[in-house]
Amino acid sequence: NEEWVQGRNHSAIEIFNEVLKNHPSGTQAEEALFRLGEIHHFSLNNSTRALIYFQEVLQMNRMGPFSYPTQKYIAEIAEFGLKDYDQAIIEYQNLINHYKNENEGSDHQYRIASIYYKKQNYEQALVELNILLENYPDSSWAEESKFKIIEVLYTLSRCPEAREQYRHFTLEYSDSRFKEDMDFVVASCLEEEGHLQEAYNRFKSLEGRYIYPAILKMKLVGIEQRMKKNP
């Protein structure tokens, strides 16, 4: 392990292969395969090879001491390395189903919701975010999930629901870090529904506070032009 930390990957690989030769099964073999997976994943940037090692760990012992971190790596490689989103969803679901004791279910549920969002399957993203809130109400992801729900509702042109959720949210989290983003979403809803003056006032109130001033400026100019056309 020390040799790997010092960056001498190939030497470490030889050592772990030697361990596997002498101990083809059991905890030492599981650790050797796990470490080989980590070396290929992090140091050699070979996620495909790493995946093979990680899968071998699980084949050897699905409930062993290395199985949970291994399953996490497999899910992350599927999502971020291979961008195989359908497989990633399966792997995160495996984490939720098989490792309840780890108390990280809400993290994996949030990843599933995020993947559906990335896939632009907003209806399913909404379902997954609501599952997160139902199953893990005290999760550290709760606040962000509630914000994401408002964002998704706006994306789905379900503005009355988005505004309703916004009202609940502001009562629950009076000084949320998502406040500006949510105000922007609600202003966009008002604009979409044709409440131009109200939308304009909301956008205007975000000046100096919103993280993307250029987009805000574009919104204000766009509404000004629409109001000139339809006074």
Sequence positions of predicted segments:
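Acidic, polar-rich low-complexity tracts and alpha-helical solenoid repeat scaffolds
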Residues: 1-231
